[in-house]
Amino acid sequence: MDYPFKTVPYAHQITALKKSWSQENYAYFMEMGTGKSKVLIDNMSMLYDKGKINGALIIAPKGVYRNWERQEIPIHLPNHIEDFTVAWTPTPNKIQKEMLESIIKDPKDLTLDIFLMNVEALHTTKGARFAERFLNGHRALLVIDESTTIKNPKAIRTKNALKLSTLAKYRRILTGSPVTKDPIDLFSQCEFLDPAILGHSSYYSFKNRYTIQVKTNVGTHIFNKVVGYKNLDELSGLLEPHSYRVLKTDCLDLPEKVYTKRQVDLTDEQKKAYTEMKAYALTMFDNGEVLTASTVMTQLLRLHQISCGHLIMESGETKIFKNNRITELMDILEEAVGEGGTQFISGKVIIWANYRQDIRTIYDTIKTKYGSEAVATYYGDTPDSERQDIVLKFQDPESPLRFFVGNQQTAGYGITLTAASTVVYYSNNYDLEKRIQSEDRAHRIGQKNTVTYIDLIAEKTVDERIVKALRNKINIASTVMGEEFKQWLT
């Protein structure tokens, strides 16, 4: 394909672009780790170069949308394209407000305007109206990243997304798993692209065509319960001209490891606790107290715990903070497990957590959604007699055990977990060796796929510095002292 790409595309990405680049409506159903963000950026660039668009509105989940600004666009947008990229914020400061107004009021054909918005903003009148203003002022490409976020036709965000779709000539949806529970999930996603794709203007007529329903009584309430599906070959045929589906197993030229991250915002409660703890640590430094390695690590540990959603007090009690990290994890799992939710799960996932409290929270949340057989924990409290059985079940493709929740110190050595090609670091350990060893539980002999590593990161906290240090192969425990400790705090 003759185009001045900034980063060289893989074969499957070229295929996706050839099929889609000039189409008005298209779905990239590409498994996590196959590079759908790059495909979208290249597609956007091609449309801009041909004079088809002068703006793009990319809507993504809260933990993802700023990755486009800080990572995906700078890495993949071709060098010859001048862009003006602005990210939505509901409470902008003076500079942010000026940038937001500028991208609305002053579109230029010599600059590609890229507006990034979190999908949750579509639940608000303010966010939806601003998105509408952007689209009305541009020849635009409208994108929903992780499009299962608009699968519920009754949700306000979905209704607003569908209204916005009529204002953009070009529309794209991106997701690794277009079907998270049942084929009905496709209706709103496809309606966003073009209602004509499925040939059903009504959600209920679509549901009747592709589901088997039986009349069910619960007390005095009578409703039709979905017990199965039908005409799925027909549904696949309708989607085929408008979508590209690829799995990591289909991509022979992918690198062995792919790293990505999800941003997690601190709640107000966490911000308050974090600010107070940081001030205390800085006071220790400024007062000239002798900072031993143990003292430094204790302060970093407390700040990291707060960013993860809890704090172990000096009394030994654990204070729990309301936090967004577990919500972001569950969003990732919904995409990673593949089509069909608990019935047709195609993937297994390793989740590493540094703290007991994190492991308990993760286990309880996954158990509630997917059932007790779908998740197991492997950490200090796990009896030795159960550990080998957990590994064997996880490695068994027929076993219902899909989620391995472990601590890097306990489970990061000596065991094989190649049944998973998705690894999530809910909270990291400071030790570089433990990070390397835990990565290699999935990336070792027997692994047939590219392994995707996802770090959950609380922005502008020690959490962010920990991940950066580990990715740069820096052992935090032996290097963060003195002035560097102060830099980590500020």
Where are the regions a protein language model picked out?
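Conserved Helicase C-terminal RecA-like lobe
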Residues: 1, 34-35, 39-52, 61, ...
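SF2 helicase motor core recognition
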Residues: 123-125, 181-183, 359-363, 388, ...
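Inter-lobe coupling linker of SF2 helicases/translocases
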Residues: 101, 116-121, 129-136, 155-169, ...
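A conserved SF2-helicase RecA2
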Residues: 430-490
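Conserved helix-turn-beta segment of the N-terminal RecA-like "Helicase ATP-binding" lobe
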Residues: 64-93, 193-196, 369-372
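Conserved helicase ATPase motor motifs in RecA-like P-loop NTPase domains
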Residues: 32-33, 168-183, 191
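Conserved Walker A/P-loop ATP-binding site and its immediately adjacent core
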Residues: 39, 52-75, 180-185, 354-356
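Conserved pre-motif I regulatory segment
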Residues: 1-29
